[in-house]
Amino acid sequence: MSVQGIEGVLQQLQVTALQASGSAKTLPAEAGFASELKAAIGKISENQQVARTSAQNFELGVPGVGLNDVMVNAQKSSVSLQLGIQVRNKLVAAYQEVMNMGV
C-alpha cells in the first residue's frame, strides 16, 4: 500500500463530499493530512445529520419534504459512510503494513 494510493482515495472522498454539498469551494493549496481527514469525517457527519433531519421532517408532515428527498438523502449518507469506512480500512491496512516492515 503506497501513500499515493491513500492520497488518491482521500481525494475521491473529498470530490464526493464536494459534489454532495453542491458547493464550488476551492480546496486550500497546502493542507495537512489530519485536517483533510477531519474535514472528510465532518462531511460524513453532516450528510448523516441532513438525512436524519429530512426523515424527521417527513415523519412530521412538513410541507415540501417528499419521500424521494428522504430516500436520496439517506442514500447519500449511506454511501458517504461506506466510503469513510473503506478509507479507514485502507489506512489501517497501510499502518499495519508499515508496522510489519523490517528496520
Curated annotation (Swiss-Prot):
The keyword ATP-binding does not apply. It is found in: Bacterial flagellum basal body. GO terms for cellular component: bacterial-type flagellum basal body. Keywords: Bacterial flagellum. One of its GO terms (molecular function) is cytoskeletal motor activity. It comes from the Bacteria. It holds the Pfam family FliE. PANTHER family: FLAGELLAR HOOK-BASAL BODY COMPLEX PROTEIN FLIE (PTHR34653:SF1), PTHR34653. Belongs to the FliE family. HAMAP family: FliE. This is Flagellar hook-basal body complex protein FliE. It comes from Yersinia pestis. The lineage of its organism: Bacteria, Pseudomonadati, Pseudomonadota, Gammaproteobacteria, Enterobacterales. The gene is fliE.
